[in-house]
Amino acid sequence: MSRKIAILSKYYPLEGGVAARTYWLARGLAKKGHEVHIIADRPDVGGEYRSQGEGKPSEKLSNFFVHRPAYEIPWHIPESDEQSLALLDLTLDVIRKHNIEILDTGYLAPYGMVGHLAKRITGVKHVLRHGVSDVEDFSKKEILNSLLQGTIRSADAVITEERYADLFKPLNSNTHVQHPYIVDTQAFALPYAGGEKKHLAVVGKINYYWDRKGLRQISDHMHNLVDRFDCTCVCQGIGLQEIQKSLGKNTISEYAWPGFMAPWEMPRFLSKVDALFVFEKPAPHSPVSNLAMEALCSGVGIITNYAGFQKDYENVISINENQVLVINPAELFATSSAITNWLGKKWVRKPATQKVSFPDYMAANEKIYEGLGATRLLNMDVYK
């Protein structure tokens, strides 16, 4: 049975794993015949972390819609841009105009909390999801704790991942455990489009811990390999000028430096890439990377400094033999030789397989929606 679903979440042009997950979930639901409405922030939010890629997917789906607040909040006392109120007002409007049955929200704050208020006002069924940083920075630290606990308790369903199940299950009996991200392998199954030279890439935001993510070490290796390989840094953020300054003008000119890409651009980009650098240790919360999963499922090799990389992914993906190369970044020349040998002789491009398929992932979400029963919107005449 097709449903009318609104997804209130982080979305393009904001970058990041949750924004990408929002797109692929919404697209998957639309392709299953559901009417899907994404409710997103104004396109000018996000500062340095706003993507400059293609504004809309080239694929046209007649049942896929995106809504954003149409105006800025005027200056008032106390001074605030009131983005959450703008999102709440828009959410109520979308629910009323499109008879939304299910409101599916991303991060706990602000989207989950806005969804909680929308449920209280309209009676819409609320499915609550979360990221990683919001659990670590809000829930575990008890920030906005009364509102957060009320949001979790009143949700019609909660979708979490295994490591956070014990946090949510005592608060909401209808808590479901899923893998945080499943790749739509059909969308990423593009033919290899690489050139004569092998192509190395790094993708990531450059924020306050860019040095701990190993971006300088990655750049050093790419500098040492640029005569043998094409090198691309898909990087953006508050630390971009700092890292470029530390590398010097000559090194910068050797790489391509595109800004962030939209989620729908990533399959085409990865079809041209032979190996992706993933230096994520130590990251603040060390999550499984959506991008690494997309790369693996596209047949891209992974170069990492983390010996436990494959173990982190073993529950979600079957990585091919020789698809991951673990290096010691301190051994610059030996590592450059190892990368050249690995790409030239050992690694043959072959997509990895997921242990949960994207169709099964979509079916699991539909089952959660079906379990909510019928929606009876409350007092919506008030908003006409």
Protein language model annotation of sequence segments:
Residues 134, 178-188, 205-207, 240:
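Short beta-strand->alpha-helix junction loop in the catalytic core
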Residues 40, 148-190:
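Donor nucleotide-sugar binding/catalytic pocket of nucleotide-sugar-dependent glycosyltransferases
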Residues 6, 193-213, 219-226:
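Conserved donor-binding/catalytic core segment of Leloir-type glycosyltransferases
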Residues 244-264:
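Nucleotide-activated donor-binding/catalytic signature segment of Leloir-type glycosyltransferases, i.e.
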